[in-house]
Amino acid sequence: MKNTLKNNPIVIICALLLSVITVITYSKNLDSTDKISRGYFAGKISFGDSTNHKLYSDKVQVKKSSERGVTVLTIVVTDNNTPESVFVKLYNVTDKGTFFIPGEGDFQNVGNLIKDVNMFREQNNFYQTTLANDEGLKNGVGRVNIIKLTDSEIEGELIIIANNSEGKQAQLESARFKAKF
């Protein structure tokens, strides 16, 4: 009986067909998972006296956590073609809405623009909303408008004006992002 099952062409065809279906299903699941986990970040950025240029990334890191008893949302982006980076940390994010940087309240939101992530020891690479400009004015601001927030996905818009320790200004404008947690 065992020999007849092994030599039966219908059994062999069914086994091959099952194998092909399994491989196709597995590969389609991999493709859809890869597309789902990818997000995007696109905006215009300028540092100091440089003209603004596009910052684009399809690798957006978003994380929801708890810090000091409140919900924290962290967004980290590094440009696909340059070492420029954006770091945003928002406190008390529980629903979509508009969040200001640094904001008011017990916890100040964070918005940093980084000119070159590879030169992390140089202070002048870090542009922060909390630093003063070259005239001594603390004019750094930011706004994050979250238009979609679910347990698995976030989408929104972002602008940041920040200064480095020398007082030079950087701007991120017209930025849009979408990512999975």
Question: Which residue ranges define each predicted feature?
Answer:
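Extreme N-terminal export signal peptides that direct proteins to the secretory pathway
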Residues: N7-A15, S19-V70
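Surface-exposed helix/loop patches within compact recognition domains
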Residues: K35-S37, K44-S46, K54, Q61-I147
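C-terminal or internal capping secondary-structure element at the end of a domain, subdomain, or sheet
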Residues: N145-F181
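Ubiquitous "structural anchor" signal
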Residues: T22-V23, F47, T51, L113, ...
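Hydrophobic transmembrane signal anchors and adjacent membrane-proximal interface regions, especially
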Residues: V11-I12, V20-T22, F41, K115, ...
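N-terminal secretory signal peptides that target proteins for export/translocation
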Residues: M1-K6
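Short beta-strand segments
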Residues: H53-D58, E84-V86, A170-F177
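Generic "edge-of-domain/loop-turn" microfeature
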Residues: N52, T82, D95, D151, ...
